[in-house]
Structure formats: C-alpha cells, structure tokens
Amino acid sequence: MRLQPSLLLLALLLLKVTTIQATLGNNSWEEQTWPEGLKNFPFPCRPEEIPFSPPSESVHSLRISDIRVVGAIGNLETTPDAKMVLKRQKWIERNQMQTCMQVMTVLSDFIKKFSPSVLPLLCPSREKVLPRMRNEDLGPQARELVQHMKKNQKLNFRNDWKLINVFFNAQSQCHPCSSSQKEGNMTSSMQELIRLLDYLQKEVPKAFVNLVDISELGNSIQSNNQENGPRDINEVCECPQEPSRLTTAVQRWYYQNSWEKLLTSGRYDTKDTFTVIYQSFLHEMEPSVFPIKQTSGSSLKKLSTALAVSLWNGMIDPTGKKEEFFTTGQRIPVKCPTQKHPYLFTYRNNNKLSSTPEIKRISETREGTEIRCPDMDPSNAVPTSVHHLRPADIKVIGALGDSLTAGNGAGSTPGNILDVLTQYRGLSWSIGGNENISTVTTLANILREFNPSLIGFSTGTGNQNSAAAFLNQAVAGATSETLPSQARRLVDLMKENKRINFQDDWKIVTLFIGGNDLCDSCSDPPRYSSQNFTAHIGKALDILHAEVPRVFVNLVTVLSIVSLRELYQEESINCPRVILRSLCPCVLKFKDNSTELTTLIELNKQYQEETHRLVDSGRYDTRDDFTVVLQPFLEQVPMPKTPEGLPDSSFFAPDCFHFHSKAHARVARSLWNNMLEPVGEKKKEENLENIVDLICPSESQPYLRTYKNSNYTYPTATPTSSPKPDYGSQLWCEDRAPSASFPTSVHALKPADIQVVAAVGDSLTAGNGIGSKPDDLPDVITQYRGLSYSAGGDASLESVTTLPNILREFNMNLTGFAVGVGSADDANAFLNQAVPGAKAEGLKKQVQTLVQKMKSDPRINFQRDWKVITLLIGTTDLCDYCTDSNLYSATNFSAYLRDALDFLHREVPRALVNLVDFMNPIIFRQVFLGNQDKCPMTQACSLCNCLLTVREDSPELARMKEVVKVYQTKIRELVESGRYDTREDFTIVLQPFLEEVKLAFQDGIPDVSFFAPDCIHPNQKFHSQLSRALWNNMLQPLGKKMDFLDLTADTTLSCPSLEEPFLRTYRNSNYTYPANPAIENWGSDFLCPEQGSSNSAPSSVHQLRPADIKVVAALGDSLTTAVGAGAKNNSNWSTAWRGLSWSIGGDGTLETHTTLPNILKKFNPHLHGFSTGTQEEAAGLNVAVEGAIAQDMPSQARILVDRMKNSSEINLDQDWKLITIFVGSNDLCQYCENPEAHSVKNYVQSLQQALDIFYKELPRAFINVVEIMELVGLRQIQGEKCAVTTQSICPCFGRSLDNSPELQEMKNINRHFQSGSSLITYHHQYMEREDFAVVVQPFFQSTVVPLDDKGKPDLSFFSVDCFHFSERGHAEMAIALWNNMLEPVGQKQTYNNFTHSRTKVKCPTSENPYFFTMRNSGLLRKEASHKTPSVPFWAVLVAAAASFIVGVVLVMLWRTKKCSRREERPISLVATVF
C-alpha cells in the first residue's frame, strides 16, 4: 500500500509534535527539545575565546553566559491578507505555537553554547494563544510567565538572569490615520504594551527584555504568495484614506520610531537589573538567506530560524547600528560576542547610539521666479493647428502620474515624516497653482503669466478626488497600469466642466510615470517589462488622442532612478531607511555592481528608449490638433549635491524619496525650457543644483515646439515609406440636430439623440488584427478595439470610419465607444464587450457585463440615455459545428441568442439593438484557399476546421452551407417573432448587409488586402466598408434594407431625410413582419454526417452505434399506442395511431414524421419492428395496450419476447434490439382510488419483473426506461374543445384542489414513482451481461407544459381530448428520447423542451458514436461477470441508491477534471476565429 504524500506529511507532523511536546509545572507553559533538522546549524562563535567572569550585577554588562532562562510572551501570528493563499494562511495559524517553540529553541541553543545550564525554553501553551492576539491580551500571559518562573525550583527568581522576549505585531496595531497626528502620540494599543513592560519592570528582577516587532515575519511568509506586499495598515485599522504603500511604510515607521524614542528615553533603565530593547525583524528575507543546509524542511522552520538569528544579532549588535537589510541570495551572518564587547548591548552601554550629527539642510525657502518675455500675447486668431500653438493660447491644463505629480511631501517641514502623506497638489511642478510665480514656480504658474484665465491647475492639498485637485488626476503610488483609468477620468472631468469649452479650448496635459514600476520591477519582471510599461502609456495616450480635441501632451520620460541609492547609502544623512526600502526595494536592496542592479539600470534605459519609440512611431500625429511631445530633461538627471559633495536632502521631502517644493520648482523650470526647445535638440540632463532661467519663445518660433515646427523627422520614418492609407469618410448631412423634444419612442429616434454606443460579439467586433501589418501574423491577437466597425472611436471620421465616429458627427458627447487596443476588461474598451473566440453560448455573459457597466458608469444616465447596441455572433459556432453538431446546432444557437436578447429586452430601457447577420464563413474559405501562398495554411485546422479543411463539392461542405442557411433563418425568425417589440422604448432591428458578401478580386484571386494576415479577420479597409454598410442599413426601411456588401464599391454615407429623419424600425418603416409559414408536418431535418454501423456487429452493448440497431420495440399504455395522435375531431380521438407513436411508429420518413424508428432508419434502412398506420395487424413490435398499468408490463414483456422468437425477420441471437418502456400514468391517475394496488412498491416490482424476462430471454438488448412525467401540469390544460376533462380521465390529479394536502401528496407519490423507476435500473444484475443494458431516460423528470404566445398551455401539442399527445407532441417526445440516448448518464437533460425546430435531432459524434450506458459514461468499471443470488426489492433500492450517489460523485469528479483540462489549455487568439 502506498501512503499518499499529504497523509505521510500529516503523520510525520503528528509524530513530531507528540515527540517534542513536554510540560513544566501546571501545563501552562511548554518546552521543546532541539529539533533534529537544526542540530547541524553552522554556529561560528567560540565561547572559549571570551574570558570567564563572575555573573554580572548590571544588565548593561550582561553576558550571554549569565542567562539562566529564556521565555516568551505573545505569539507569532501573521496579519491575515486577502490575497494570501487560504490554505497557507490557515496552516500558519495552526502552527503559531510551533513557530514560537522553534524560534526559542534556536535562540536557547545558541545560548547553551555559552551557558550550558540554561533552563528549557518557555512558550505560552496552545490554550493561552488567541488566534488574533492583541496587545491587551499579553497581560495575562506575562503574569502567568512570572508565576511560573517563581514556582520553578530550578530557577533562583531573585538572582538568576532572565531573557524575556515579548512578541507583538505592529502591523496589527492601529496607527494614526492622518498626518495630523503628532509623532509622540501613543495609541491605546501601545499604552497596553507599556503597561505590560511596566509590570515586568516592577515584578521581574534581573531581566533583559526584547520587545520584538514581528510585522515583517508575516510579510516574508506572504511575499511568496501575493503580488502587492504586506497588507495595508489602513485596511487593518479601517482608516478612511485610500491604502497605499507609502501610507503603510510611513505609519509603520511612525510606530517603530515611537518605540525607539520611548526606550532610548531611559524609562526602563532606571534600575541596573532591568532593560527593554526594541528589536525589529529583518525587513526582507528569503529562505536562501538562511545559513541552514537546504533540505526538505518547511519554509516556516527556516523563517523561525531567521527570526532567532535576527534576535541573536540584535542583542549582539550595538543598538541603533543593527544590520537592517539583507538582499536576495545574501546569507545572514551570525554575530558573535568579542573580547572587546562580550556583553549584550543596551541603550546605555552603546557608545555608538548617538549618531553622527546630521548635515545641516540647506535653506528650504520656496523658490519663486519671474518671466519677462517680449511677446506674451496669444495668437491673433485661435489656432487650428497644434504646431502653431503659443503659450498664451493654452486655456486648460491637466496632469497624470504618480505621487511626484500629486505632490506628496512637497510642503512638509523638515523631519515631519508623517506629513509626507499629505499631497501638496498646489506645489506640483507640472500643474500646481498655489499663489503665483513670484513665490511658487510651477508650469501652471508660468502659463498663467501668459494667460491669467488658465484653468485646470490644482491648489492646496488633497487627493485626486478633492475639488482643489481639479485636473491634476495623478494618483499617489500609481504605476503605469493605472494611466488609462486616470486618462479616462481626466477626459470626463474636462467634458463635464462648464468652464471648459471642450471642443475649442486648447489644452496642455503633462504625463509623468514610471518610478513605482521600476521600484517594483524585480518582484514581477514580466509585469513591469518595458513593453507593458509603454503599452499602458500608449493606452492612456490613445484615450486622449481619440477623444480630446486641441491637446498638446507633454510626455516626460522616467528619470534615472538609480541615483536614489546615493541618498540611501550616505550614513551622514538622516533618512528613514525603513521607509525608503519599503517604497523602492528593487533600487535599494541589491549590492553595487550586482547582476540585479545592472538589470534594473538596463530596464530603466529600456523604459526611456521604448517611450521614445512610442512617440517616434508618429501614431499621435495623425491630426492637426493633437500631438505628443517627449520632454527628456529628467533622463540623466544626477543626484543634487551640497558644497561638501554629499547628496543634498533639501531637494527631498522628509522621507528622502519624494520631491520637496525646491525640487518641484527646479523641475518646473526644466520642463518649461524643454517645451520651447526644438524636438531633436532638447536637453536630456538637467542639474537641479543650478537655478536655470526661464527662456522665452523666440520671435521666429513663438510656438511650443513640436516635431513639425521643429522640422524634425522621426527616426522610424523612411523617405520611401508609403503614406498611411486613409480610411476616413465624409458625411454631407445638413440636419445633424437632435429631436426638438427628447424622444420617448424608439421609433422616433434621430441619430443625434443617441448618447451611448455599445457592442457585443466575437473577435470581429473586438477588432482582432484590424491594424496588423500584412506580414505580421502574431499581431492578429491584438484587439484594435478603437478601429472596430461598430464600437471603435479612434481619431475621427476624417481618418477612421466607424459607427461611433459617424454618430459623433451628430452628437459629440456620445460615449461608450472603445479606443486604442486591449481586452474587454481594459478601461479603454468601455462598452465594447466583445470577446475574441466567443460563441453564442457566452453571449448572455457579455450582455450582463455590458448592462452592469452601463448601470454603474457615472457618464451614463441608464434610465434616460438612448443607446445603440450592436450584436454580431455566430461565425465561431459554425467553425466548430462539425466537432459537435449537437452543441452547435441551430436550435442551441437560436436559444443562446434569444437568452441574450431577452436579457437586454428585460433590463435595458431606451435601446435600439442592431442585430447584424454574421459573416458567412464560406467567404473567408474562398479567400484562404485562393491565396495559399499568402495565408497560413498550416493553421487552417485551428482557424476554422469545419470549413477550411473540407474538400470542395464534398458532402461535408454542402452540409455546412445548409447549416449556415439554417442559422440565418433562426436569426430572422427570432426578430420577426415580434417578441422584442412589446415596449415603446426598445426594439431589435436585423441589419442584413452581411447576408451576401461580394469579394474583391485581383487577377481572378480574392484580394487579401481586405484581410488581416490570417486571411480570416477583416482589416481596417474591410471594417471601413462594414461601418458604412451598417450605417446605411440603419437608415434603410425594413423590407428594403441592403442585404449584400460589395467590398469594391465606393460606398458613401447616407443621410436621414427631412421626411424620414429617424433610425428605421419596423413601425416607422410601415413594415409588417411576415406571418410564420404554415407548418406542413412535424418532421425533422437530418443533418448528421453519414455514419455506418460498426465494422463488425458489436458484442458489447457499451459499443452500440445507432446503425447497429436491427430491431425496435415498445411496451406501455395509450401514450405508446398513440391514442388520438392523428385525430382532427372528437369522432376519432380514441383511435390508436401507432404509426405516429414517438418510440415505435414508422409512418413515412423522418422528414414528415419524427419518431424514434424514423430517426434510426436514417442509420439503418432495414430496421424491423416499428408499427405503421392504425390497424393492430400493423403494430409490429408495439405491444403497448391502452389503459395498461405497471402490473401489465410482465405480460407485455412475455408477448414481446414470443413475437421476436416467432419472427422470421429477426435473428434473436445476433440482432441488436432497442426496447422502450413507458408506463405509470394510469397507476398515478388511479392511485388515490386504490393506493395498495398502485403502490410504488408494486410499480417497481412490475418493472423489475418485465426487465427480468428480457434479461433472461433476450440476448443483445438495449432497454430504455422512460421516467414517468409530472402529471400535475395536466391541471393547466382545459378548454371548450377538450373531449374529456382532467377530472374524469385522471381523477387523482384532476379532482384535488390547488394547494390541498391531497394534491401535495400526489406530487410526492409522482416523485416516488420517478425515483423508483430510476433506481431499479441500477440493479447490479442488469450490469452483469456484456450484451444487456438498462438505461433510464429522464427527459420528463421535470415536465414543462408548453405554452403559446399568450402564456397559456399550447393545445397543439395535445390531442382533442387534451390529455393524450398529438402528432406534434409525439414528435417532441421522440426528439427528447433520442437526444437523451446520446447524452451521458448523469448528464442527461431532465426536462422537456417542446419548442418547434426541424434541427433539434442530435447527432452521434466521432468521439462518442455510441448510445450511452452507465459504463461508457465513465460511471462503472468493467468487471468480470458473476452471478448473484436474487435479493429483495428494497435491498435493491438501497444498493441502487448507493450506486446512484457514487455515480453522481464520479460524474462531478469527471466533469471537474474535464473542465480543468479545458481551463488548462493555452489560449491562442490567432487560432481562434471570431
């Protein structure tokens, strides 16, 4: 027997705990012997080198050898973190006690080297450790520890030296939540600790107390389990301000600094026999730094050892000079006492405590300036080109970025570290507007000298949401990932502000980001790659470029951040290094000249180079009123120095990280000067030590410099490069005004009334490959959402033709469109929620997400705004149709589409939905196969297997063409049903322009210039035509809409007419939906590929294909004899129309009559046994009898066996037989009149007896047992035309009152009948033979009465007696039974779906060509046959129930495993069609 690893680990853990645990005294405290794994710890100290001396009388000359006992108070819990792996968090909580023991064991073992007689360590017992221990909980532990030491006979309490460690977690304490708190303030939690220390000082003589802050222990444990570092203190303490790394670092520093100040004050040094030392766990640590041989030991043990080593070193090192930081890969050295310093360091005996006097900070007076230029006037006329923009033309200023733009600490007084949390936005270099230029130098104040009416600048203090921040939307602690959302908010603020003329005012926006990305880059290199960095910037710029007219964007490149190390490493400067390390670990934690530092420096350069490349691409110079100019003055900025050559901290806030107002002023000067320097000649190195003069625009060049007015050519451009194609359009409409009064009807909706645009669908709508270069196949995965025909909003209509850009010509305040590139989750995707590779099945999720976004977005008035939503789906379903014709059937496609549209209809007010007919995949088959030298032929299978890999003129291709037509028909039927025209403010309009696509040809070959490199996705050239066709379709009346798209046509954009100014709907088109065509018959279309029988007749029922069935038969009552199935009036309603019977009828063909035999005849035309007509002589093997009950089943079974044996057409031994049993309705209907005769027990026993006969007499048999339906629904069926009433034909259900106990009892009995028939099929006896199977088919388990359009029972499914089924009902039962047979046991549909469709018949698949049984469904293992004695029926039920439960569990496991396999598959959008 093999022991599972998890069980082995548990066993060893229990063994270890049992072995090491012992007790002292009253079991309140626990000791631990030395763990085996730590005995080989490389301890370097040599006690014999320290001269012997008698025990010390003073704690300030205490040696290690003097310590007699080691104890601990508190626990080593970690602060829970929402992102921490839950299992690991729980494991840590369970092992807090063990951690304390391990830490104290290591420490005790160190001490034993010097003091062999030291007593066993003391830790609180498990019972005393609370799961969330706070400082106030430590008091009882302290008192118990003192009592234990007093009672311990091995310890001289008055004279022996004691080492007591008080563990607490500063991170779990509530620090001040605002910078208004003074540093000296103590929280109540700190006061609790002080009371504890006061108690120890009073009660415990001769004690050295370590106050151990283990905050970073939790962070070290969590560092391997989360991305964003330690849990923020604001979250723990519920502080109102937003959590940030800066807040966490500053507040933790505040707490630790407060303790240091208190302890160095001498409060606990009033006696020579007692002292308290503050010890902080090492800031960052990995297992690799532990001086332990790397074995399979737990990381928790390693962390415990690290904490012990940290404590040891803290006692040996001079206080205030402790080693605070170890880098990745650096091992922690174990410090040793020396002859010169053999004692434990205290605050009193530390002659190094008084640090080197701080270098005096240079004056921090704010720097004003002045600017006197000869020409400070605006242009004579408001310029239309950004390349002719004077400073005085700027009317609006904005900024994006991080805390350097937010102004954190810019106005803080020296030493006030808490105040660094304050965001002095009014002093910010790029947008601050405090006072004026004479006292505060900022870009905004400089521009105000040219235009005093400038708006947008920030003043005072506050975060980005404060009113004073205005258009300074920088977020403290931000990385480049947040830029798109910042840009989005900035645009919205500019649009909403009434003081800003959004269309006409010239705006300047400064963007500066990257420091925090670099500071975190080593923790997640892929996340902070240069590619991602510039991609995030690109997305933000895309938003500005797409939406904001008249903008000059300053893109300031990231500074060279490595110079920060100079400030950190200079010991003479009093910087809070704990804060610096927390804020920027990747810059500070590595050694000089290390590989890691070199990597950081290289990444810094890549950030700068990639930013240059982004701007040099010219992608933001496609309009005359927009440009992005790179301002590189910070790229090589050196650390400013004092006259003594030391880093000048006066340029920095008290945290030595953020800029002080002095630096802000110098940087503002440099930015201004950079803006007036020609592109290509801008300064990249600015020495902040020097106060530079502000330059003026020259007479010859009075403009802010751009690439064009600098006569600059981007390096990436080549003289021979062809000009970028123009895909814009002209709109010549005169009337672009909205309705005179806000419309309330969707049928009176003008284009200018549309305020919101949205889209859902697949990769065509997501924009895959639209902007890809012809030879760049991998780029097809890029989602160019801003160029998408129905939802893109890049640039304007002049250069990019999309539906939103057309609508923006009518309403410039349109919202919802996407810009740039990215996934549906990106902010710039907005309401383009299309997902690449999406199928109809996932459409409802898309519309749910869309609606949620519309409801929650402040830019959208969900109830009032008019919306246009465009939906296109279906191509991907068709491309996968041949892989599973059941899953991708037209019926399922229609159902999924209906669910999504129903949701929109139900949830969204004021909406016009464009339902665009999908693009026929036959089109790109032509393109793909016609350009085999240009298209990726090797990817044909993954791109669209069902169409690209089949032969021309093959049956498979013909079948696919038919399926395409059925899909299109389903879409049209759905819209024309009128179900979405029940409200005045909602409609769905079918836009059919893609029904037929005329390709462009070159030399007789389809022109690939309209397609992306995969020859599948349309490129921008194609999308432009799609946009024009969609728009024109929207203006064409129903019944006259263009149903084709000519890619070669020079399509112009239509305009609403004066007579018809509205977007066209069925009503304003005076259109009447065509009446549904009369249904000629209830037949079905057979769309399954040709599938023959097995190569040889199978010997196993678990490998039985439909074509293997030679004989069909049935048992049952009047529902199987088909009483009334073909009746047209009361005169013949009692006739048995056996030829139409769902399970055994064989009249006509499948195309005219849907029955199980007619389906089977498509696989085997030589099928025997089915019944025809109405005469009993033609009943075949239909032995059902009208009025039969379960007790009749054994006799029917006997009759059937005899008929088979006597038939000359049947080879009893060799022919495979399919028998369907359906009985029980009469038993239920008569149950209340004779419960004993019609009991569940009798019902099940009768079924078992019939099955036993078949099992004994019939070889090669597959038995369908159909669960009885829920008869309570029959009560709904009533009408004047009904020949009989439910009361008379089924009294037990018809006579009971609604909600009566009698009716409820009958419902229960009904369920028991279902359960009984289901469980009996699990009898082990029926699983013993390889050629016999009984399978329950549960499609009636939850019976749904079909309803008509008015919500009443649809009597077309019932015969004239309103009880038996009509031919339509029999057809639906046949389809449900057949489909059940092709569904795995445990996954069968358990309800009837009686909706008409000729394509609902499922097909066997190549993966699953057999009828499903228990075994081939994966629920049973193949076992050797063996005989078992007969058992009582109720024992069978118990066994069957157990088997059923096991089966359900197995199914769940199988499905989970299957789903997990699906999830593990890599996603390749290149290999995903639409």
Curated annotation (Swiss-Prot):
What's the top EC group for this one?
hydrolase
Q: Sorted alphabetically, which InterPro entries does this protein's record hold?
A: GDSL (IPR001087), Lipase_GDSL_AS (IPR008265), Phospholipase_B (IPR035547), PLB1 (IPR038885), SGNH_hydro_sf (IPR036514)
Keywords attached to this entry: Cell membrane, Glycoprotein, Hydrolase, Lipid metabolism, Membrane, Phospholipid metabolism, Repeat, Signal, Transmembrane, Transmembrane helix
Biological process according to GO: phospholipid metabolic process
EC number of the protein: 3.1.1.5, 3.1.1.4, 3.1.1.3
Which family does the entry's similarity section mention? Belongs to the 'GDSL' lipolytic enzyme family. Phospholipase B1 subfamily.
Q: What is the documented function of this protein?
A: Calcium-independent membrane-associated phospholipase that catalyzes complete diacylation of phospholipids by hydrolyzing both sn-1 and sn-2 fatty acyl chains attached to the glycerol backbone (phospholipase B activity). Has dual phospholipase and lysophospholipase activities toward diacylphospholipids. Preferentially cleaves sn-2 ester bonds over sn-1 bonds. Acts as a lipase toward glycerolipid substrates. Hydrolyzes fatty acyl chains of diacylglycerols with preference for the sn-2 position and of triacylglycerols with not positional selectivity.
Protein name stated in the entry? Phospholipase B1, membrane-associated
Q: Which organism is it from?
A: Monodelphis domestica
The gene that this protein is the product of is PLB1
